[in-house]
């Protein structure tokens, strides 16, 4: 993810770093590369136009002209504007209620059912929650079986009923959670091949009956620009509180992450990093911008390493990776520890 975008942005940054001052000509040349890089990464055209105009305007400002290191200032402007696109970083969930209720929605095939298991697993580990999963996708028997299988793998109870009234199942499931002392409820809802009225009416009814604190749309980042229409389609009917972008570790160009929040106003809460049950991570704009600009996501490296090595060694490893100084022995050392 972002490899091509990172390379092209680095080229643009290096052009400015090689100049003594920023001028209309050299900034226009650099911004042309930035514009093409973003478009090739599948960032929305309107977003690209607005972004490049703002960067150019700031780069030609008086403070930048006075700078002894215009390349560094240009890099900071790029970073600040990318952060503006991605949002303020408020990806935290509202877990203040007892039980806290999270309703997951999405199109058929978006990976909603597996994601609900990943989210329950994450919140149990990170927040110490006791989750209950509710199987309210009554139109696809395989979805209920899949959720039950996930529940067995994770040792998390799944609430299901033999009836086909999804609204009633959700309502009964929440009551069951209260009786049994669960402090977190995650509701798996039905998906469709496209946004339709029947789907939305059912989701609106569930929302009205159980009043979830979070309504999160699960979306496959591989669908690119179509993601914007899907987010807006759901958000027009439901008060979405966030999105989960799946398959951000795959062949996706990543443009949807840079377009979605800016165009829809719906924050990204989590991103999918693998198909494994721990392959979900809280979205952090600072980290993503760091990756885009070629600095690497050092904090993620450290967090992953801390599970098998101590903090001091993790920091040393991360610094080596950032500086490009890791040798074969370093890699072999981490590989040996990861399989212990």
Residue ranges of model-derived segments:
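Amphipathic alpha-helical interaction elements
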Residues: 39-43, 63, 83, 191, ...
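Short hinge/gating elements
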Residues: 14-21, 34-38, 58-65, 287-289, ...
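Generic start-of-chain signal for non-secretory N-termini
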Residues: 1-7
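Conserved small/polar residues in nucleotide/adenosyl-binding loops
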Residues: 339-340
